[in-house]
């Protein structure tokens, strides 16, 4: 079904596929580079923030796919009949949707990686790239499960919007993607370091 949707919306989809990495870099990476010149370890900020931009990019790509599948279609009672009547269990359907959405997010992240390595003076070796992808897969599975759980538990658009706003605040600022944990108060820093979404990124760093 995702292939069919891509085929019927090929030009807009490809346009957004390449526009999103540029937009994220222009709106987040470039301004913060002029504010935070170096990390606390003395690494140039544009190099330090590179993996964080990839994780943010994949997060932004993952959310719309799962939101539509598990919230929008559900509350508007537009679940496709062939999906509702499938002989597969609900767990398999949810897992399949998560995998497909994760693969699409990985494609966007890969395009972003190629784009950013052309702009940022960073050298990625093959082992580093493979480990980055492994950490990204674990992160997307955790984040995807969070998105799905929230989408299934909430039935009103207003509540969903507020909750997802808080989730994205956590994604942007509470995982060490853009600013280091040391900038937070000690107790809150420990909480952020040990919350599940931040662990894959910390493993890569």
Q: Language-model features: where?
A:
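Membrane-interface helix termini and inter-helical loops of multi-pass transporters
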Residues: 32-41, 117-127, 185
């Amino acid at each position: 079904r995702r292939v069919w949707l891509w085929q019927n919306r090929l030009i807009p989809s490809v346009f957004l596929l390449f526009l999103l990495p540029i937009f994220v870099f222009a709106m987040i990476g470039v301004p913060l580079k002029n504010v935070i010149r170096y990390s606390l370890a003395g690494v140039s900020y544009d190099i330090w923030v590179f993996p964080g931009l990839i994780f943010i990019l994949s997060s932004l790509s993952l959310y719309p796919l799962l939101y539509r599948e598990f919230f929008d279609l559900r509350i508007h009672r537009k679940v496709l009949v062939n999906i509702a009547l499938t002989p597969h269990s609900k767990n398999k359907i949810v897992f399949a949707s998560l995998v497909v959405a994760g693969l699409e997010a990985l494609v966007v992240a890969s395009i972003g990686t190629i784009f950013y390595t052309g702009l940022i003076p960073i050298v990625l070796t093959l082992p580093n790239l493979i480990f980055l992808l492994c950490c990204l897969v674990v992160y997307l599975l955790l984040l995807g499960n969070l998105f799905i759980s929230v989408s299934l538990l909430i039935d009103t658009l207003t509540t969903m919007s507020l909750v997802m706003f808080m989730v994205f605040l956590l994604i942007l600022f509470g995982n060490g993607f853009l600013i280091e944990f040391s900038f937070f108060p000690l107790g809150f820093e420990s909480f952020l370091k040990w919350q599940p979404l931040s662990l894959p990124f910390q493993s890569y760093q």
